Amino acid sequence: MDVHIDNQVLSGLGTPLLVHLFVPDTVMAELCPNRVPNCEGAWCQTLFSDRTGLTRVCRVFAARGMLPGRPSHRGTFTSVPVYCDEGLPELYNPFHVAALRFYDEGGLVGELQIYYLSLFEGAKRALTDGHLIREASGVQESAAAMQPIPIDPGPPGGAGIEHMPVAAAQVEHPKTYDLKQILLEITQEENRGEQRLGHAGSPALCLGLRLRAGAETKAAAETSVSKHHPALENPSNIRGSAGGEGGGGRAGTGGTVGVGSGALSRVPVSFSKTRRAIRESRALVRGIAHIFSPHALYVVTYPELSAQGRLHRMTAVTHASPATDLAEVSILGAPEREFRFLISVALRISASFREKLAMQAWTAQQEIPVVIPTSYSRIYKNSDLIREAFFTVQTRVSWESCWVKATISNAPKTPDACLWIDSHPLYEEGASAWGKVIDSRPPGGLVGAASQLVALGTDGHCVHLATTSDGQAFLVLPGGFVIKGQLALTPEERGYILARHGIRREQ
């Protein structure tokens, strides 16, 4: 769980309020069914439910590991920054959504969305009756960690999830030491003002005495070195490191030359206060139901950390609102707003195809040479195929769609830079393939990339949507027939897409 420490100390976020998570592999498999991701980072942002907009994207660390107490549970440890309601430091909106986009060496793994309600309530319950998985020493794990971890019951009718009380038994174990523990003990004694370096016979005492003996021996050796000039430091010393090594007195004062001992002052070892606090803190875990899926997530809390203790004081704004205001609250505010935005753009692209096809007397030219000569055209008026193709393009939407990637791309602004293609099975016979990139820099646009698109035209079970960075759109039908359209976005829509993917720039 060192990744939680790194996020708490090194993330550099504007808010110290973090909810630490463990995401099981069963949840990650929903995001990326093709491989077991080994993520080292995630991009997080909050989608507001009560207003349009979202927070800036921030990067947090992530690491794959095993959840203590559940040897069969492997997954990804990470943290989620959460934000209070505007002007109300102790209130949060339970219907805000935290979006985490995971990445590994293979690229994007997927996006996980979590309601603030799950994060805050899971953290509060973990602080009150969470399962102990690490003692306060911060070095040894509790033997009670091998017992089942309590998980909140899922929604009615969902799969049953076990619930266990807090493990109160404390089991004695032989104490073990490592270098981190020794340095930690020395630091604690320094903070308490003690002069000894550990109790009798402890590794901290042995290490401290040997380090002190080495320093004193070196100091004695340096002192015994004869000096050939008062203005010089001891041989092999860095100039100025030993202080005033013998500067003569001021003129007319009759000052004498001072000779220093050459011994360097000891600097106490110091760690980040936050890092030390979280290492010394207990670790409590609590399972929560993930509202967007039937799976469970786990919230890990560190009670001795002051920033974590603040989570226990947070209250949902719905608890402080009158019943009349609650009637106007939309639980699906953020997800619904995003879905409507994606659908609206897809409908406009489909409408441009329909308009172009009507201007061509409902005929489409074969631009991809499959089997039939390219001069062949086909009439699609009142065609079941074109009706199903339009319906598929209008209803299958994603933030990984080709037109989204074309919008956020940094490719040169030329008509023939790159093509991004979505492949959709007709009649809902399978999953879609999103945002495949095809290089079309040779002149000719879609025709110039025809050799790379032959496989798309020969697939009689799929319809393909292609877009370019300059706003061109193409609908590729079975047989290589192509309908041309347009991707038109307002500056506000383009800015929202860029902000959703962590890009802030003038358009």
From Swiss-Prot:
Q: Which UniProt keywords apply?
A: Capsid protein, Host nucleus, Late protein, Viral genome packaging, Viral release from host cell, Virion
InterPro entries given for it?
UL17-like (IPR007640)
Compartments reported by the entry: Virion; Host nucleus
Keyword Membrane listed? The answer is no
Region entry Disordered: which residue ranges?
Answer: 219-257
Q: Which cysteines are joined by disulfide bonds?
A: none
Q: What is its main location?
A: virion
**Ranges of Gly residues compositional bias?**
241-257
What does the entry list under GO cellular component? host cell nucleus; viral capsid
Which GO BP annotation is one of this protein's?
chromosome organization
Q: Write out the similarity annotation.
A: Belongs to the herpesviridae CVC1 protein family.
List, alphabetically, the HAMAP family matched: HSV_CVC1
Q: What is this protein called?
A: Capsid vertex component 1
Species per Swiss-Prot/TrEMBL record: Epstein-Barr virus (strain B95-8)
